[in-house]
Amino acid sequence: MKLYITKTPRLIQQIFKNYTWRFFTDKKEIYLTFDDGPTSEITEFVLSELKKHNAKATFFCIGKNIKNNPKIFEKIISDNHSIGNHTQNNLQGFQNLVGLNYKNEKVKANENTTYKVLKTLQENLKLFRPPYGKIKKSQAKKLRSLGFKIIMWDVLSADFDTSITNQKCLENVLKNTTNGSIIVFHDSKKATEKLKFVLPKVLEYYSKKGFVFKAIA
């Protein structure tokens, strides 16, 4: 099944240098990110584990899931984590990125759920992660003109992949993470089993090594 890379090559990062792939720092800092939430299955578990380690993270939320789980979403905010836009429905393919309807002047269409809710809770929603990392240059240009930062990653946990073991998912993170890494997890139903196994171990492992888990500003 594997059609993904767990460690983003430097060449790709250099070619698409207008996107944020990682943070260059000598400090022991890691940036955990969670896509596709909030969900009733796993997001509250994630928040609880983060709190145990005084860890901050960034949640790239889907509009429809915010609408379906408003209390959990408010908990993300009240715990002082960062919020990013992951579109309205997380549909695959350039033409289906409807959350921020990229076509013409409709780029702000995501206000129907995500942006409108966030506006009252967090003044500047300026972090965006395209579903599956797929985005056209024209789309990216339009987003940047609106002040958005496009946040990618340099470490992919692959917690969404049901064909790999929990241990392999953990190894994907531990073998590839360095200072300033942006790591992708998913607080989704599909990733629940792996995330419950991996996240506590990642938090404990790097906390013992003196790392700080930071939210993307």
What are these regions (language model features)?
Residues 37-41, 105-108, 193, 197:
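Soluble non-cytosolic domains of exported or imported proteins
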Residues 61-66, 89, 133-134, 156-161, ...:
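Short histidine/acidic/glycine/proline-rich micro-motifs that form metal-
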Residues 3-95, 99, 123, 212:
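Active-site beta->alpha N-cap acidic-glycine motif
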Residues 47-58, 82, 100-137, 141-146, ...:
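CE4/NodB-like, metal-dependent polysaccharide N-deacetylase domain
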Residues 134, 139-176, 210-217:
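His/Asp/Glu-enriched short active-site or ligand-binding loop at hydrolase and phosphoryl-transfer sites
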Residues 43-44, 70, 140, 163-166, ...:
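Conserved strand-to-helix beginnings and helix N-cap segments that scaffold or border functional pockets
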Residues 174, 178-217:
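Catalytic grooves of carbohydrate-active enzymes
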